[in-house]
C-alpha cells in the first residue's frame, strides 16, 4: 500500500452544475470530492457547470478535503475547454474519464502541466492496459468506474461482483506496483446500508484505499470501514513492540497471539498506524 499523507476513505461525487450541492459539500465528512463535469451534467448544462465550478473553487472553502475535477473526455466538444479552464484552478487533481491506454493521458498532460492526473478505469481495454496506464509519470490515482465497466462487460449485478473481480484485481496490482492511490467504484443503492457496508468490506479486503460514493448518506459507513479499527491499531502496536523486543535479543521473528510476526508484518503494522495518524490529522484540520 502506498503511504498517503491524505486519507481517501470516502470520495464523494458532486455534480458541477448543482450550486446547492457544491455549497453543502463544504460541510460534509468526505475525505475527497470529485466535482463532476461529465456523467452527472446534462449536455445543455456543460458550459454553465464549468463556469459555476470554476467560480466555486476560487471562492469556496472546502478545508482539507482533496478536490478532484472530473472533466469531459477529449473526444467531446467540452473536454479541451474543461482542461483549459481548470489547468490552474484551485484543485488538487484532474480526473480523466474512460482511460483505455497510456496515450489517453498525453494530451491532457500537455494541457495541464502542473496538476496531478487521475484516471477513470472503466473500460475493458483499460483493464487490460492497467499496468501501462499506471506507469505514466503524471498519474497519481485511479478511480474504478464499475457502472461503465459492467455495461461494457454485459454483466449482471451480483453482491460478490464476480464479473468485476478480474478487472478490479488488475487495476489494484498496477496501482500498487506504481505507488498510486486507488479507490473502488460506487454502490448505487444509496439507501441500502447493509449492502454498502458489505461492498466496502469487500473493497477493503481487496486492498482499495477507499470508495467512491454517490450520496452523503454513504459517507459514515465508508469512513468507518476504511479506517483502521481500534483492534487493528492495538494489534499493530503489539506486533511492533514484540518484534523490536525480539530484535534486541538477536531474533528475526516474534510470536503474537500464536502467530509468527516477521518484518513484512511490521511493514503492514506501521502502515496501519500511519493511516490512523493521517485520519486523525485530517479530522483535526
Curated annotation (Swiss-Prot):
Function comment: Catalyzes the hydrolysis of (3S)-malyl-CoA to (3S)-malate and free CoA. Inactive towards beta-methylmalyl-CoA and other CoA esters.
What does the entry list as the binding residues for substrate? 70, 122
Q: Where does the chain bind Mg(2+)?
A: 122, 148
Q: Which family does it belong to?
A: Belongs to the HpcH/HpaI aldolase family.
Describe its assembly.
Homodimer or homotrimer.
Q: How is its activity regulated?
A: Reversibly inhibited by EDTA. Stimulated by the divalent cations Mg(2+) and Mn(2+).
| Entry EC no(s) | 3.1.2.30
**Source organism per UniProt:** Cereibacter sphaeroides (strain ATCC 17023 / DSM 158 / JCM 6121 / CCUG 31486 / LMG 2827 / NBRC 12203 / NCIMB 8253 / ATH 2.4.1.) (Rhodobacter sphaeroides)
Induction info = Induced by growth on acetate.
Question: Which Gene Ontology terms cover its molecular function?
Answer: hydrolase activity; magnesium ion binding
Write the protein's name. Answer: (3S)-malyl-CoA thioesterase
Q: Name one GO biological process term.
A: oxaloacetate metabolic process
Q: Per its UniProt record, what InterPro entries does this chain match?
A: Aldolase/citrate-lyase_domain, Citrate_lyase_beta/mcl1/mcl2, Pyrv/PenolPyrv_kinase-like_dom, Pyrv_kinase-like_dom_sf
Q: Which reaction does it catalyse?
A: (S)-malyl-CoA + H2O = (S)-malate + CoA + H(+)
Amino acid at each position: 500500500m502506498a503511504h498517503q499523507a491524505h486519507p481517501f476513505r470516502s470520495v464523494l461525487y458532486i455534480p458541477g452544475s448543482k450550486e446547492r450541492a457544491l455549497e453543502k459539500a463544504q460541510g460534509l465528512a468526505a475525505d475527497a470530492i470529485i466535482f463532476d463535469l461529465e456523467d452527472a451534467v446534462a449536455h445543455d448544462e456543460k458550459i454553465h457547470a464549468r463556469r459555476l465550478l470554476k467560480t466555486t473553487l476560487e471562492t469556496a472553502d472546502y478545508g482539507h478535503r482533496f478536490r478532484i475535477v472530473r472533466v469531459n473526455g477529449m473526444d467531446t466538444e467540452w473536454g479541451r475547454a474543461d482542461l483549459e479552464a481548470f489547468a490552474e484552478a484551485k484543485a488538487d487533481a484532474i480526473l480523466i474519464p474512460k482511460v483505455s491506454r497510456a496515450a489517453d493521458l498525453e494530451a491532457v498532460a500537455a494541457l495541464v502541466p502542473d496538476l496531478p492526473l487521475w484516471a477513470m478505469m472503466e473500460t475493458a481495454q483499460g483493464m487490460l492496459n492497467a499496468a501501462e496506464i499506471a506507469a505514466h509519470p503524471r498519474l497519481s490515482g485511479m478511480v474504478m468506474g464499475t457502472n461503465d465497466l459492467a455495461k461494457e462487460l454485459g454483466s449482471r449485478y451480483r453482491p460478490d461482483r464476480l464479473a468485476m473481480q478480474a478487472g478490479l484485481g488488475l487495476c489494484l496490482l498496477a496501482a500498487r506496483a506504481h505507488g498510486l492511490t486507488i479507490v473502488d467504484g460506487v454502490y448505487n443503492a444509496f439507501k441500502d446500508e447493509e449492502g454498502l457496508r458489505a461492498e466496502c468490506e469487500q473493497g477493503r479486503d481487496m486492498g482499495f484505499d477507499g470508495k467512491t460514493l454517490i450520496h452523503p448518506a454513504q459517507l459514515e459507513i465508508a469512513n468507518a470501514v476504511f479506517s483502521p479499527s481500534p483492534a487493528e491499531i492495538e494489534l499493530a502496536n503489539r506486533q511492533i513492540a514484540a518484534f523490536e523486543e525480539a530484535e534486541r535479543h538477536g531474533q528475526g521473528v516474534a510470536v503474537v497471539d500464536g502467530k509468527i510476526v516477521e518484518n513484512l508484518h511490521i511493514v503492514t503494522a506501521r502502515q496501519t498506524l500511519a493511516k490512523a495518524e493521517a485520519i486523525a490529522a485530517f479530522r483535526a484540520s
